[in-house]
């Protein structure tokens, strides 16, 4: 899914089947109101094929959250043979980039739309979904940043270590694109000294993998240069065998 990050699509990540059920409406509702297409993604096979009991949405609840004015505007903007319009005409580079810059305001406004619908879902379900979610000790000095199914495993590790008095935590990335640095900074514990960023990919020849580079840029721009940042690239994690 990292290959899609430059397409202009917003990208929303889920960790497990229940989160897929809970947050999929956010992608649809925010796409309609925010006027930006969404990629709603989760781990292929690890999450998509997982057998798990989940709480399903009541369509009446979804209807209450739907902005019908935005739906009307969305339909009016769609291609319609009764109201033909020309799109995708040729542009030279100078005009194309002016159009791309003109889109900035839409992407800057989108996180607030996503956050609004997450808030509506939290009210319905009693959850606490946010652009980034923190889990662990309030005074953690070591933090993992990750997205996808690894987060469920990481939560179990956090529970095990905090029960032993370790000061550790996890930040789960929900809205991957647009990347919101301020939202990430809000959930990083003030006591954090070391951060490990987990990327489930490998880009040979790159300075770092995608999520790591986003986090590194956020910390650099915020002047948090004292935090030790570590990149971790993985496909799957295994426990060491006992001797």
Which positions does each model-derived feature cover?
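Conserved small/polar residues in nucleotide/adenosyl-binding loops
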Residues: 235-241
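Conserved thiamine diphosphate
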Residues: 1-44, 68, 217, 221-233
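Metallocofactor- and cofactor-centric catalytic cores in central/energy metabolism, strongly enriched
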Residues: 172-176, 180-181, 212-221
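Redox- and metal-dependent alpha/beta enzyme cores, enriched for Fe-S-associated oxidoreductases
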Residues: 139-166, 179-184
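Conformationally flexible catalytic loops at phosphate/diphosphate-handling active centers
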Residues: 38-133
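A general structural motif
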Residues: 113-129, 146-154, 173-181
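Short acidic, glycine/serine/threonine-rich loops at helix termini
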Residues: 22-25, 49-56, 155-157, 182-183, ...
